[in-house]
Every structure is written in structure tokens, then in C-alpha cells.
């Protein structure tokens, strides 16, 4: 089978097939109509290794072009001398990790073949954005793993502590992840919860975090074995169609964007490739991220006590940090947006719940109705691009949320004195706006907004309920979406002692 492939750093014409050279610290390679002959990979590896050993590389650039499976697996990944040579450089800006090269083809594809030209980051604590479209193009996983169908007796629970729970977009299925290295899908039949299927894929470590794609056709699972598995819904159940590899340490979390085009993962690696983007603003470990519910705005929180917001730069499509919140005095463990994206809730080590709201530039104190240069609502996307002089409202149901890319976020409410230990999780009910928090004191607490001061637009919150769902630390919680009954709300919680789904009266 013929494979045409080109790796380059300029538009300069390169030598023929199998040629290698360096110029000004940059490596140039050319492979055109490379045929998968058994002896060729070793010859190419020797030639490339010799070239690298006589050169000092300050920058190695890789293009979008798909690389031959055979070349990668036999030449790059199996040749130890080549792997060693690729780790050599006179500076630390661009290094190809020997560890990465010793892993599978999937690792190199997922890390190097992004939609734009990328290099390694020297940051220790970073976020990574994968493009779901790239996963389809490059077919990162060539081995599909199907689900195992379990019985419907509701007894197919996890065999280890449950780390995360996430509802599907429709609210019909609840996914849970565990230290038993499985993901389980649950649904309600009458008054019982039944395990629909158990997803046992290639991951060999605790599955720490889950995230559903926009329509529920994809489910991403992040594991302590340094991989992220993306499951795709098929006719016979969910299948693992992509495995994102290459992290040197555990993947702490994963989150789909609202558009479904991006997957964010966070971890603490020593050196990382940039995929769609590396967001290296935090100075310490990233604990959680949250995508804005209607646009590609990403928020992250960290051990460095800050919350940061990122968006794509419209001029060059690079992802930039557009705002930083530094009013937390300790680790921020979890963040979440409300249903329309106008507010963000944050909890952390200081046992405090904080609520932030977005305000336009020039309005640091807030106002009853912040005036923006654009209006954002699902039915009004990309419609207004200049200043608003007049606003006319119709009587159709729904909420129109003023929004702008250069909004600044301000803390408008601080709730303290409720939890007695660190708060690890928070979630906003999309229908009732009730905030649920949980943490190390084993107690779930529910908060509701009671009043808004018209001069500053700052709300007050009151505790409306609390209960103990577990006997050990709570790791996560999630409200079920799309519940027509506003009086009875489903809330899933997970802890070291298992999974619990409760029906709570609002």
C-alpha cells in the first residue's frame, strides 16, 4: 500500500524519498510514495538516526499530514537509537520524549497531528485540547472494544470506590466510573436502577473522570493509567473508538465542549505536546475544568488557588487566557456554570462556595442589567456584531443572556460556615438553579438564591436542605437534566463507598 507523507518546516523543496537533513536547527524529512517494504523502515531509521546524531536541533515541526502506520510503528517506535536521538537538543524548548516514542502509534498520532503546527511545551501543569474532528480523521484507535451487556437485576455495581458520575444530555442514562477500571451505564426501570452495560476497554487504571458529548453519542473516560478513552454509541452499544495516549502521569479529568468539537483533558506531566492547544497558565496542578454551556469558553481551577478562563483568539485561532480570578485562598477543587452560562460556582479547600458572574468591561461593580455588545442565546448565535442601541423583547419562552468574549468575572456571593471539611464537588440544577455541594464531611447541601440587590446585582443564597448520602468522602455529584417534574429532582452522588441516586423535593 502506498502512503504519501511530508513532514516539513517550510515550503522549500526537499530531497527525494527517504532524505533527511537539518538546517538552522530544524529537521527536514521527506517521504513520498513510501511503500511498506519490511526492510525499508530499518534503513530509514538508521539514516535518520545518523543525521540527528550529527545535528543540533532547536526546533522540530510536524505537519498535519497523516503518517504511515508502518513507518511510525516500525521506524519511530521500535528503533531505540532513533528514539534516543530524538530526545537530544541544545535547548529545552522542543524535545521529543523518549517515553512517548516508546509507546504506541496512537500516542504519536494523537499528540502530534493536530489541526495546526505545534511544538512541545515546557510547562509542568497544563490543559490539553483535542479536536474530536481529528479523532475521526486519524482513526486513533484501530481496535474496537464493545460493551458487556449485564443482567437487569440492578446488582451489577462497581467493585471499588466510585470516582465520578455524569448524566447523559437527555437524562435517561447515568454513567459512573470507578477504581475497578470500568464505566457502568445505568437507567431507571420503575423504581429500580438497572445497569444497562459495563464498558471494559483498554484502560488499566482507575477511571477518574467522565464527560458526555453534546448529543450523548460519545462518552469520554479519563484514567490514572495516563489515557483517555472515547466511547462511541453504535447499534450494539458503546465501543471504544479512540484512545488518547502519551501523558506521562495520570489524567485527572476530561470534559467535552458545548459544541462537541473539543475534548479537554488535564494532568501534571513533565512535558507535553500541543494538540489543539496547550493552556499553560496555571503554576500548579489543574484540578477541574468546565465548558461554557453555549460557546467555546473554557474555565479551569487549580492547586494555585486561581480560576482561569480561555477562549480562541479570533485573529489567529490560538487559545488565550482571557480572565483570571485570584480571590480564593486555597485549592479550588471544582467549578461549574449555570444553565445559561451567566454564572460560575466554585468550591475548594477553604470550605467555601463562591458564585461569580460575568460583567462587561467598564462595569466592575455590576448593574441590574449589564449592557453588552452582543446578545447570546441558542436561537441568536452570531447575529449581532456591533453595539446594542435598543432591545425589544418578545413573549416567547426562554432566557436571553447578554454575553461578550471580553467579559470580566466577579465574585457576587460567598457562602461559608456550612461545610466542616473541604468541598470537593458542586453542581447547578439546570431547571431550578439549586446549587448542590458535597465534600469531605459526607454531607450534601442544597442552596437556593433568595434575593438580588438591584443596585449591585448581587444575590443572596440560603441553605434549603442537607442530607448524608454516604458514610465516606463524597467524590462527586450531578443533577439529572431534562426532568419535567420541577418538584422532584434526581441527584446522583458518588463516594468511596459507592453510588447513590436520590429524589429530592425542590
Swiss-Prot record:
Q: Does the keyword Secreted apply?
A: no
Annotated keywords: Repeat, WD repeat
* Pfam hit, one: WD40
- List the InterPro entries hit by this protein, alphabetically: CIAO1/Cia1, WD40/YVTN_repeat-like_dom_sf, WD40_repeat_dom_sf, WD40_rpt
**Repeats (WD): which ranges?**
157-196, 202-241, 246-281, 282-320, 327-366, 418-457, 469-506
Q: Which GO terms describe its cellular component?
A: cytosolic [4Fe-4S] assembly targeting complex
Listed PANTHER family? CYTOSOLIC IRON-SULFUR PROTEIN ASSEMBLY PROTEIN CIAO1-RELATED, WD40 PROTEIN CIAO1
Q: What does this protein do?
A: Essential component of the cytosolic iron-sulfur (Fe/S) protein assembly machinery. Required for the maturation of extramitochondrial Fe/S proteins.
* Family membership noted in the UniProt record: Belongs to the WD repeat CIA1 family.
Protein name, please?
Probable cytosolic iron-sulfur protein assembly protein CIAO1 homolog
